[in-house]
């Protein structure tokens, strides 16, 4: 008899818990934050935001003063990056996304890759961190600057990513296309370092804050890679011609084996949304 009562009590507790969870789920508002590759900073940023919101929601559910008045549940899946996130927000599939400030500008103004697809309702929520655009090269490739990429195997980034867009902007400013390289790849940010360490590519371009764990891996693996300088009148022209670009420097010693400063240009990582998303959620 005691066993029956104990079992019945357990069932009732589980049932009560499920009702409680169902009530919370029904009252919660779900939304999605687009991020980037699973090893990148955007993915970490999106999931950190979700974690903070979940913690706040749990506090409120338990009657704590610092909790939110309304329960929010969010997901932050790995995605193709900046332009993909903006496109999904425009389509109403995502409510938020992390994106480079340059692609935020182009989407709002209908320029560059967003020509004919203007997204005037795109809004910035806040900036996260600075992101220098870095071109990394393996040591044996002997690449010192952009001209040294001629005849090399270069990863230009996956379609829809911020790194792909910025690389194409830089190539356009330099007056070159894909034929300038021996060949190009379209690897994601999470794939490119392994490809370099395995000797499959000579170089890649990437917009990312520093220091970065994946870049340190590129510096310490068999590639012995390091960031190169991006300077000259063409790069300065990009900086002078756009408010979202600025000169950036990766100080020497940031990465293993980096003996000199690497001068380049950079943008900011921003969390963006749509004007159609309710103010209460933002």
Regions found by a protein language model. Give the residues of each.
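Extracytoplasmic
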Residues: 28, 69-71, 81-84, 91, ...
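C-terminal segment of classical bacterial N-terminal signal peptides
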Residues: 11-25
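Bacterial N-terminal signal peptides that target proteins for export
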Residues: 1-12
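Pocket-flanking alpha-helical
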Residues: 47, 65-116, 190-195, 201, ...
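Pocket-lining segment of extracytoplasmic ligand-binding domains
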Residues: 101-103, 112-113, 141, 177-278
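Bilobed "Venus flytrap"/periplasmic-binding protein-like clamshell domains
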Residues: 30-62, 72, 131-198
């Amino acid at each position: 008899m005691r066993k029956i009562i104990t079992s019945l009590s357990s069932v009732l507790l589980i049932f009560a818990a499920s009702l409680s969870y169902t009530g919370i789920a029904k009252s919660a508002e779900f939304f999605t934050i687009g991020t980037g590759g699973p090893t990148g900073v955007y993915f970490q940023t999106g999931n950190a935001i979700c974690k903070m919101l979940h913690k706040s929601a749990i506090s409120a559910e338990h009657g704590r003063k610092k909790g939110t008045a309304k329960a929010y549940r969010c997901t932050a899946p790995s995605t193709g990056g900046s332009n993909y996130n903006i496109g999904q927000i425009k389509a109403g599939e995502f409510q938020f996304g992390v994106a480079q400030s340059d692609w935020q500008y182009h989407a709002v103004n209908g320029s560059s890759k967003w020509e004919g697809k203007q997204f005037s309702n795109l809004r910035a929520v806040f900036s996260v961190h600075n992101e220098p655009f870095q071109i990394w090269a393996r040591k044996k490739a002997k690449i010192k600057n952009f001209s040294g990429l001629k005849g090399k195997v270069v990863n230009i980034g996956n379609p829809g990513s911020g790194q792909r867009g910025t690389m194409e902007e830089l190539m356009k400013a330099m007056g070159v296309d894909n034929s300038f390289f021996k060949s190009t790849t379209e690897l994601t940010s999470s794939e490119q370092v392994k490809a370099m360490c395995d000797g499959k590519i000579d170089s890649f371009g990437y917009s990312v804050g520093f220091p970065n764990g994946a870049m340190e891996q590129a510096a310490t693996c068999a590639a012995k890679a390091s960031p190169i300088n991006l300077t000259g009148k063409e790069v300065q022209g990009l900086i002078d011609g756009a408010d979202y670009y600025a000169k950036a420097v990766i100080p020497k010693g940031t990465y293993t084996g980096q003996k000199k400063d690497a001068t380049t240009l950079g943008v900011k990582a921003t969390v963006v949304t749509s004007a159609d998303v309710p103010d209460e959620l933002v």
